[in-house]
Amino acid sequence: MPTATLDGTQVAVNDEGFFESPDQWTEAMAVELARAEGIDELTDQHWQVIHFMRKEYAEKGTGPTVRVLGKTSGVSVKELYELFPKGPAKVAAKIAGIPKPRGCI
């Protein structure tokens, strides 16, 4: 199983870099993950989406799709693509330390 070292801690990840155990995630790790995805600074809106992703995963066992994010996170789909240009659901899930949402390529 692949691993990554984030914030000085070794964590188990899958072949695409998504956490195997979301409980290992910290906000400091999120900052490092965001930088690796080309996001230099996490704004309040980024954190809103990240925390929403983690809440949805905790409640439903999967991260939300872009459509669900746009309708229920308080951030529009257009804003989601501005915040996470490489793909809102996939990149936000990776930064949030949860598995890739179903339906993401």
Q: What feature does the model see in each segment?
A:
Residues 18-24, 55-58, 66-67, 79-80:
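A short, ordered amphipathic alpha-helix with a cationic face
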Residues 18, 62, 98:
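Gly/Ser/Thr-rich helix-start
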Residues 30, 35-54, 58-59, 66, ...:
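Metallocofactor- and cofactor-centric catalytic cores in central/energy metabolism, strongly enriched
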Residues 13, 65-105:
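Helix-rich interaction surfaces within compact, conserved domain-sized segments
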Residues 4-37:
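N-terminal first-folded block
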